[in-house]
Amino acid sequence: MKTYLVGGSVRDEILGLPVTDHDYVVVGVSPEEMVHLGFRPVGKDFPVFLHPQSQEQYALARTERKVSRGYKGFEVYASPEVTLQEDLARRDLTINAIAKDEYGNIIDPFGGIADLEAGVLRHIGPAFTEDPVRVLRTARFAARFGFHIAPETLALMNEMVHNGEVDALVSERVWQEIARGLMERHPSRMFYALRDCGALTRIMPEVDALFGVPQPPQHHPEIDTGVHVMMVIDYAASRNYSLQVRFAALTHDLGKGTTPPEEWPRHIGHEARSVRLVQGLCERINPPNEMRNLALLVARYHGDVHRAAELRPVTIANLLQGVDAYRKPERFEEFLQACACDFHGRPGYATRPYPQADRLREAFQAARSVDAGAIAKEMARNVSDPSRLPVAINTRVSETRIAEIRNRLGSLA
């Protein structure tokens, strides 16, 4: 029985990155022997065990054989006869097929260290094409490490797209990889990689459609809407914003991809079109509701936020009500963050001030200082017709909030 540290933990250690999870492969032992040694079996699709003390995962060396389409279409074979090299050969990229034994010796049969040093993402062999998730994973690693994809690997990814393998991915896996990619340091690199191999138009055609669509150069020096959106998500990443903010940043301008070319570079009404496209995208890839809800709000209202200095107090009050700021103040802050990312995601705008967000924060603080409960009690004493009471309360609360917003913003002028 021999135990090896494998995969991402070895890779990250070589790169000098923090190692949080340890994955082990065990060679020369049966499942029964693992149980006898005190390991607890937890694997559903292949033999994986938890160490009796550390609770870390130990997997028996295995091989895999493609038997049907999709990422689950594999037949797994695990036995004491499977070698370490055979186990490493089933992995996706050379940088993920490095092992270390208990004495610290490195086993690198596929040149992963050389590719780490060169900053290259390279597939191990033709079996790479058997798992469509590898298209997304490879693109995500490009975002994580800033590595470039080897031309021959990119060609295989393109082949997988054209063969329809990517179309077999279930929504849960697509969202899982997109979410992880958005949380990398440079998420745009994932989407550029997906576009390079043709996968973006299959997975997120709404985003792919943004590339090549011009915007007014006086507002968008980058001109290309797709490039703008990539700058927006990278800015969100540079600020360490949440996944909700990053997803909203990715989807806020989807409607510009449907603007008729004869109307370019203007995009009148793109906010409403963006809302419909965000709804369709979310129905397809099924992100959590908090992602969907924030993305819809940003798509609908980001133009209003950019014009905050021009908005009347009543319009600001309606905006606060529309984004449900009073009941969800934390989400309102994320809403403003996403709108700020849209502003900063342009050449030369990263360090410019964005007073619109602060203006709306001030307006919100003024509006939320209104005691709606006290107003309700007062109105209950003064309104004789109970059927008119709800409308009367809402009207008085709204009028008071508008007055507070007017006073607060007037004092800032």
From Swiss-Prot:
Pfam family, one: PolyA_pol_RNAbd
NCBIfam families (UniProt xref): PRK10885.1
Obligatory cofactor(s): Mg(2+); Ni(2+)
Protein name: Multifunctional CCA protein
Binding site for Mg(2+): 21, 23
Record: residues binding ATP: 8, 11, 91, 137, 140
Entry's cofactor comment: Magnesium is required for nucleotidyltransferase activity.
